[in-house]
Amino acid sequence: SNVKMKKVLFTANLDSFFIKFLIPQLKYFKDNGYEVHVASKDQGIEIPYCDKKFDVCFTRSLNIKDITKSYTTIKKILIENDYELISCHTPFGAAIPRLAASKIKNFNSKIVYTAHGFHFYKGAPLINWMIYYPMEKYLSRYTDSIITINDEDYNTAKKKMKSKIYKVHGIGISREKFDIKVSASEKMKLRKELNIVNDNFVLIFPGEINNNKNQILLLDTIKILKEKIPNIVLLLPGYDLLQGKLQKYAKQNGLYDNVRFLGYRKDIPQLLRISNMAVSSSKREGLPINIIES
């Protein structure tokens, strides 16, 4: 049939962002007959429910060359595809597509921006207010709706932004995914694979390894705790954006036996089951999703 399928585009900075937060949304549109497109920096991760993947690098770097390149790429994608809806996530993954859309004549796709925590808030570094605040304020006029996930963001947006503002209570987590039964033998197998013995006290912090998540703080904490609890082990499942810097730090500080860098994992619910305690060291998160998940 020549009935054109409705198309939706999701944008975010990294592939891993989709895996962590957006699978239910991708599935929803796929189940409702949309052709689902995704634009983000390619990390070689298979994204489910995605019909077409564009590799666009919406970096956090304020490098003009990078920004221009991603701007040109996404503008071309928007012109060629006539999306019914564009769902934007992460500051630059949302800013660059909206900027591109604002420069397209007769552009009529709906744009929804989900702010998973604005980078400007009471007590945020001044530089954040100088960069992100004017950017978000300016771009809000090219946005049909902004969805915020906490009160402070909602109130700031209500006062300052030119767009419909909504608030949802957090981004939600999938209960079924975490309400799993893990058999004793599965746990044993996983412990063995991760080289964890029975008397180990296991901490876990799932999340991308980056400066904002501040995992180095946990390594320093382990160094102190190790004196009291020699059998302590920290699991760090997550894509490494610091190019092995943290591993080196662990080695230099004699923590290599106490920290497991697991890379990107799909079995977080199982890993939580073999851990004694979930921890978080993020500098900028309200109620971190990993603490709720545990």
Name the predicted role of every residue range.
Residues 54-55, 137-187:
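Donor nucleotide-sugar binding/catalytic pocket of nucleotide-sugar-dependent glycosyltransferases
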Residues 88-94, 115:
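Short His-centered aromatic/hydrophobic patch
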Residues 20-21, 65-72, 110, 120-138:
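Nucleotide-sugar donor phosphate/pyrophosphate-binding loop at the beta->alpha transition
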Residues 10-67, 152-158, 167, 241-242:
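N-terminal strand-loop element at the rim of the active site
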Residues 27-31, 129-146:
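Membrane-proximal helix-turn-helix segments that form the acceptor-binding/catalytic region
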Residues 247-263:
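Nucleotide-activated donor-binding/catalytic signature segment of Leloir-type glycosyltransferases, i.e.
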Residues 264, 283:
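Aromatic "clamp/platform" in nucleotide-sugar-dependent glycosyltransferases that forms part
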